[in-house]
Amino acid sequence: AASDVYKRQMPYTATRDIPYDSDAAAIFDALAQPHDSLLLESADIETKKNLNCLAVLKAALKVTCHGQRVEVRALTEAGESLLPSLEERFHHRLVSRETTTAVFEFSLSTHPDERERLLAESTADILRFLQLEANYSSPLLPFLGGGFAYDYLATFEELPEVKPGANTYPDFEFLVAQTVLAVDHLQGTAHLEGWDIDDKRLREELDSLASLPAAARPAAPQKEKIRAVADVDDAGFRADVDKLKGNIHAGDIYQVVPARAFTVECPNALAAYRALRETNPSPYMFYVRGADYELFGASPESNLKFAPKDRQVQLYPCLLYTSDA
């Protein structure tokens, strides 16, 4: 019965052209939802010119994975319409179902062959289904945007337990887009694409978004000194590096990336992302606005620059995470 209801609510798709703005972040700032939205941008490393942008302005679903458990939460009525088919496909994994949420539990494969373990049904199949089996489509939709944590590997392999840290980002969290923004800087164009189970509501919403002006440019940041606090002091980090060099010499490992975390005050993460974009334009730049966190970064990043003339060293962050906690 649930799948019959789902099939009766066939989604509609629509597009709208909107005024172009060379600062895609300004359009995003004006049009995107205050939570559960994301901005992806690309720039040429050599010329530093912006190339294109893709942003999730509104999400229908939020998919969050902790270990072997995946929670799919509907953020809109359109998102609710996707839950029955998901429930039908993964009924053998379903452990909880409410009006706006469905929770699925998977298990770690114990097959002796590594390839078979990777091919076994896993939490990632939820994402694959939402991307590949959607009953709506447009040039950009369906679209899922989000991120994987390093610890997600532990859902495929048995690894030593890692102590909880200050970073509470889940194993993965993805948004299933309902309204997206696309900006082509080379052509000087921008447009919206969206889907919904109510055609009239969809078109009215796109018309409303298309009529909104872009957000005002932020004031130039004040060049004040900020204090960064490291989780490992300089002496401790040097000791870690010396120990790892010994491990390489002994043949225990052949490659390693020692790292430490720095904490700074970040009252405006979107402004900080814009500053990073200005100083380090990259092919892959991202700003993610979750329910209780913001995540941004650039890749490939200029991690370290050395000027031999004045012997100045500059460090650049590759990923920044802010939390309301």
Segments (PLM) and residue ranges:
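Extended alpha-helical targeting/anchoring segments
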Residues: S3, K7-S323
